[in-house]
Structures are given as C-alpha cells and as structure tokens.
C-alpha cells in the first residue's frame, strides 16, 4: 500500500487545532505511515516531519511534488482580464494572496506590509473567511487600511488566473505549509512571488522567488518594493518562475508516481 502525506501541521503547530482533532489525526497518520509499504510526501519539509515526529525510516518515503491546473499556464485574453477586473471590482494596483484566511496563513503580515508601501498599492486576499479574518480587519481599520484591502470569498476557480495576472506580485506569508500550490499557480501565470521562510515554500517557489520571515512585515514590504521599483527584476523573476514550475508538470508527477508503484510490483 502507498499513503500520501501532505503535511503534519497539526503536530508542528498544535495551537491551530483542537486537542481531540490532533489526537485523531496523530493516530491515523502515524498508523498509516507505519503500515504503508511506501509513503509519498509532497515536499522535503513534509518528509523531514514524518521522520522527526513518527520515527519513520527515510528510505521508505518518496518526495513527489504537487502541481496545479493547466489553465494557469494558458494565455489570458484582454477580454477576460477586463471582465474579471469589473466583476470583482479590482483596484488598479495590487498584490495578491490566495488561501483560506486563517491565522496560520498570516494575512495580518500582508495587511501590515501595506503601511510601508505606496498608498496606491492595495491587497487582494482570495479565500474563505474565518473568525481570524474579522480580527485582521479590525487591525486594518485601526491602521486606516480598510479601503486598501479587498477580500474575495467566492471567486470562481476559472477566474483565478486573471486575478493573479493583474497583480504586481503574489505574497504568501504563511507560517507553515505542506507545499504551497498557490505559489505554483502564481508562477505559472507569470508574476513574481514573495513567500515566507520556515517551511516548504522555498521548495515551491524555487530560486527565482524572494523570501522573508513570516514575522517581519517591513521585510515583506521591502521585498515587494524591490519588485515594484525594478521592472527588470520583476520580469526576470517571472521568467525564472515559469521555468521552475516545469518540474511540477503533470507529466513529471505521473512518471514519478508510476515509477513508485512499479517498484512495489
């Protein structure tokens, strides 16, 4: 049998989970890892966690990355770009972040970064709202940033590429991820990425992205400013990103999975 483990965030950051849920997840994941013939980890970071938390032999674990929908690599028509801008009432200039708006994703750092960026730079945050979202928006109101933040909770999946494409940068300040598919989506579209250090995001973003501490809003703003002020850098990051994501193509992933299953026959 083969089991795929996306992350062990419930052990790495237990404060984000209820005790009962942690206990159930720990039992299920540990048992699955012990009895599987092979384990697929979606990042080297997840592989290390499986070894560290469950004491699993590293040779039993294969790292096979994830990819994203092919539509993110397709050309976006001007008509689609205009339609999406109008439908979602997008600002002229913005950076984008995508993912459930929960505390682990660290939306507050992206909001705080606006304090150090030009007044015409906005933040578009795409994802399901949680109680944490309200907490962040209260902070935004205190800082006079409400008008520069655009929360989109119900975005059609096929509209995501155009939302990314209109952004000047994608920011992903999450404290911890198993991989980071939104980063792959953004690079496939062709926009620069600034992500957080501390988990697997360097694996997803590769050498062409910028990385900052998830606890340093000024550093996040400085990285975004580099992109805004250096068109050559922004273009180079976009090209490197498109090249890097080729390793996450469905052909590469399918080949790796087939090889893994063949090895067990």
Which stretches of residues belong to each language-model region?
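Carbohydrate transferase catalytic cores enriched for Leloir-type hexosyltransferases
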Residues: 1-265
């Amino acid at each position: 049998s083969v089991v795929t483990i996306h992350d062990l965030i419930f052990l790495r950051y237990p404060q984000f989970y209820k005790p009962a849920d942690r206990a159930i997840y720990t039992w299920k994941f540990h048992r699955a890892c012990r009895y599987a013939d092979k384990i697929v980890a979606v990042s080297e970071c997840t592989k290390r966690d499986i070894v560290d938390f469950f004491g699993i032999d590293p040779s039993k674990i294969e790292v096979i990355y994830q990819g994203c929908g092919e539509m993110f690599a397709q050309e976006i028509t001007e008509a689609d770009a205009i339609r999406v801008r109008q439908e979602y009432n997008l600002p002229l200039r913005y950076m984008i972040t995508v993912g459930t708006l929960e505390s682990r994703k660290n939306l507050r750092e992206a909001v705080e970064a606006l304090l150090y960026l030009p007044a015409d730079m906005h933040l578009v945050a795409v994802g399901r709202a949680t109680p944490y979202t309200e907490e962040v928006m209260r902070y935004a109101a205190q800082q006079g940033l409400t008008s520069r933040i655009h929360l989109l909770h119900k975005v059609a999946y096929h509209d995501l590429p155009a939302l990314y494409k209109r952004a000047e940068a994608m920011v992903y300040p999450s404290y911890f991820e198993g991989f980071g598919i939104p980063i792959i989506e953004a690079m496939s579209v062709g926009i620069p990425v600034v992500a957080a250090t501390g988990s697997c995001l360097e694996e997803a973003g590769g050498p062409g992205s910028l990385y900052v501490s998830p606890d340093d809003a000024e550093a996040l703003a400085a990285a975004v400013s580099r992109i805004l002020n250096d068109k050559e850098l922004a273009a180079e990051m976009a090209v490197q990103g498109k090249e890097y994501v080729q390793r996450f193509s469905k052909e590469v992933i399918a080949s790796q999975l087939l090889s893994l299953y063949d090895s067990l026959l």
